[in-house]
């Protein structure tokens, strides 16, 4: 059996989790999600199948060589050492794409030119003949990716972006790429709706991309079946017999699938758009199965052929760029909402928009919100259940807010105003807005970009539980209005004092991890599955301090949690890192965070171990150590319990023993009554740096943590 080959699939930003699931379903192994794509392993047949069947990938890349490329000459030499005669003939054609990040070579076209020169010169020197350049349909297309002067040179098996299915009529512009349209449909739940015979309607279909992609999904049609060109067709190692077998299988599945398509209709007010949609459907071989008709939104009616299965209304309405356009579009979104309420009761709906404010005029509460990107534009997909209880104004009249709730709302507004300038100046997107500022409303409100995390502090026994519940209901009523978010964007959790293993207590496995940014780092957070989210907001300055200290250093991260400090250290130029935690769940999360930032490598190790046992046996020394233990901990994996006040002398001494000469230990914990035992650590220089590590959004709570800079005397 052949050894698995490494590949990388690119995808639109925001689609990565869906892509990873799709790759696994298509037989890929060792799938690892990163920003704008996913790496995986498999056979060449697996890669062919993904090229043919992936609805979400943009390109499928097969790395040929990895090397350092600190200057153009080093790049040229490394590319020239690749045996290109194994991949193409001297009479063949090639093209080169290049993407550079944090590279000393700072011009992508120049880098691509040096790759081309190296390939061509190798053929000229060895065969006295050189390949020619074909930018449109070369025999092989190469992809050069350089990050931090480390280069990966890959064969682009797709040849052209996979969103080009081959059915878009020439000269027809589309606001959505086909793979983004497929992602919208998957997030909207169309596969389940279509499988049960539900109808699909797009009332503003444009050139028909959403309707056609929906038909390809439900009819089990391989999206690549109509493509005229592939990047592996002229590759010398192409296995034509494997590809032909996959094509034949796809044709048979398509023929069977087309027999069971439900009612699928696209409407648009523009006659040119309808003509384009019909032509696209013809090129996709679906014209006999889809309907495209001219219809104003105001004239939209119920679909008579929908049957009892209901269906999905999905659309990408215009969202305007100029002020006048936005004003006009408010009535369009309101009209869409009126049609949904009047004619599509019992259906599901999905609206993809680059202006979420306009979507509020639909007048129906979304039950799911997803962040996707249309090119560089951040957009939202809002999913709706068309049911009366979801309509704005359908709830029973609410009693006026109590005086306390009004004061809570005003405090939120005051905090927003006070933080606004600081947030902009420091480029902070995840922060604490409120932390029991009013003791009666004992919650912490954290903002994670466009989502809200609310933690209710457990009320003392002296507080009437019914009063506490009433105030919590008021909190949840006030937040959407003040923060201008949908209720579904708010996650509520009860926070209790940690006991034993509760710091790793799992809650509801309903949540998904999503990306947030912290300066130049990206992290995955999860607001529902655990008591904590994966990102301790109060340690933001500490992480940036570690990043500033890390260049060229060996870094050890102890009690590492999700590895956010490791990501900062690597971003700061740490030469090597070791990340230690006793939870496999959090170590896997830490590795995912490093991959998300495209920083993975053999120089960055992850160790699942009891930290105390690890410190006792570790022999290596480190220039920079971050030690952030819990206040109290015990688990089946630990031989003893950890009490930070009782045990801090021993654990600090063990960690400090691993410092190199001149090395620095940053020690932190969250025990509010912590007292450093200086007398028991005379060999160490210990400086309290807590004040410098408390961020502005936690200034009201300066005891949220304590932090110490420790060196050997």
Swiss-Prot record:
Highest taxon of the lineage: Bacteria
Molecular functions (GO terms): 23S rRNA (guanine(2445)-N(2))-methyltransferase activity; RNA binding; rRNA (guanine-N7-)-methyltransferase activity
Main localization, broad class: cytoplasm
EC code: 2.1.1.173, 2.1.1.264
Gene3D superfamilies given in the database record: 3.30.2130.30, RNA methyltransferase domain (HRMD) like (3.30.750.80), Vaccinia Virus protein VP39 (3.40.50.150)
UniProt key word Protein biosynthesis: no
Compartments it resides in: Cytoplasm
Pfam families, A to Z: Methyltrans_SAM, RlmL_1st, THUMP, UPF0020
THUMP domain mapped to chain residues: 46-157
Function: Specifically methylates the guanine in position 2445 (m2G2445) and the guanine in position 2069 (m7G2069) of 23S rRNA.
Family from the record: Belongs to the methyltransferase superfamily. RlmKL family.
Entry-linked PANTHER family: RIBOSOMAL RNA LARGE SUBUNIT METHYLTRANSFERASE K/L, RIBOSOMAL RNA LARGE SUBUNIT METHYLTRANSFERASE K_L
HAMAP family documented for this protein: 23SrRNA_methyltr_KL (MF_01858)
Protein name as it appears in the record: Ribosomal RNA large subunit methyltransferase K/L
Organism: Syntrophotalea carbinolica (strain DSM 2380 / NBRC 103641 / GraBd1)
Gene: rlmL
